[in-house]
Amino acid sequence: MAPTTRIPTETEIDVEPAPGETAGDVDIAAAAALMADPSRAAVLAELTDGRALPPSELAEVAGVSRSTISEHLAKLQHAGFLTVEKGGRNRYFRLAGPEIAAAVESLAALAPRFPVRSLKQSRRAGALGAARTCYGHLAGRLGVGITEAMLARGLIDREGEVFLLTDAGATWLEHLGIANPPRAGKACNDWSERRPHLAGRLGVALTGRLFELAWLQRTQRTREVRVTPQGEVGLSHELSLKVAPA
């Protein structure tokens, strides 16, 4: 008996407006207006590393009072930019998701830089430009440098806005101690270097392992990271990267 040929069924798509539909096009201006306030912009930028911080620390970052920061945080939470977590009697705020961090980083790549007016600001800007975290992955000169070294060694390939892990890259990451590494990551445009660094699940996995190996160390500021002496040796041996001492 001859096998029967299966005829694909039609898929019906309703392109008529839904009854009672009230939502129109996206209001980009409303989202931009929330980020246009310098204090709220400072809060969002400080939280791009993915961690949760209390209002007291965010008030210091934004340079405003506790009562004022509460108003800003309420607006950002209401708009869906932030989520709040409770720890005992305290509240901690974090970005609602990686898409918020990506939006902040994308705007930062287009934004002018603040003029540096003090030694403290100069050191802060230098540290952020050298190495920082963005929602769990590395950014700055270190993040871009590691990404470009991996590309040069055939550990990853770039296809559009995606970095794909090669077989050689998977073997290398397993050698570093990452079992079953993610096979892809995003190409995130670095606002300070104007070149892409490795983001997404692959970037987060690699960054997390570098912290576990004590090659990286967090500073008192949440986003800034420094390379340890072990990290200098490890990055030189594995990727031929020479990292200047902090």
Which ranges hold each PLM region?
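Basic, amphipathic "hinge/linker" alpha-helix immediately C-terminal to the N-terminal HTH DNA-binding motif
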Residues: 85-110, 165, 169-172, 231
